[in-house]
From Swiss-Prot:
This is UPF0342 protein GK0640. Belongs to the UPF0342 family. It holds the Pfam family Com_YlbF. It comes from Geobacillus kaustophilus (strain HTA426). InterPro entries: Com_YlbF, YheA/YmcA-like_dom_sf. HAMAP family: UPF0342.
């Protein structure tokens, strides 16, 4: 990565870490960690998601009962106030990161578009 872009990426990382949405997410993780029930439910959902992701990466079929198990675990987790808050904050942070990525990719997208229009 060129030095100026690398420096800007580091500044962006620091800005994300210092942002209020990230700090809220960090506090939500700490709240879940301190609550044994919420932490166990979080770990269960994470484990199920990882197992399904691994199967998907291997090209293995995900069975309907596995999907149902994941949906039930997620529904149960969403009933926990701390986990529901954590998931909502994660979603917001993911959307923010996606918007930043979209902005960063704009020059490349414009280059591709102008290249294809030039034919």
């Amino acid at each position: 990565m060129s030095e100026p872009l690398h420096a800007l990426a580091k500044q962006l990382e620091q800005a994300i870490r210092a942002s209020e949405p990230f700090q809220q997410l960090k506090r939500a993780y700490e709240d879940v960690r301190r609550d044994e029930t919420a932490y166990r439910m979080f770990a269960n959902v994470r484990d199920i998601q990882l197992q399904l992701h691994e199967k998907q990466m291997r090209g293995a079929a995900i069975l309907p009962d596995e999907i149902e198990q994941a949906q039930k675990a997620m529904a149960l987790a969403q009933q926990n106030e701390k986990l529901a808050r954590l998931m909502a904050l994660e979603q917001q942070m993911s959307m923010t990161i996606a918007e930043v990525q979209q902005i960063a990719m704009k020059p490349l997208e414009e280059l591709h578009r102008s290249f294809m229009e030039g034919r």
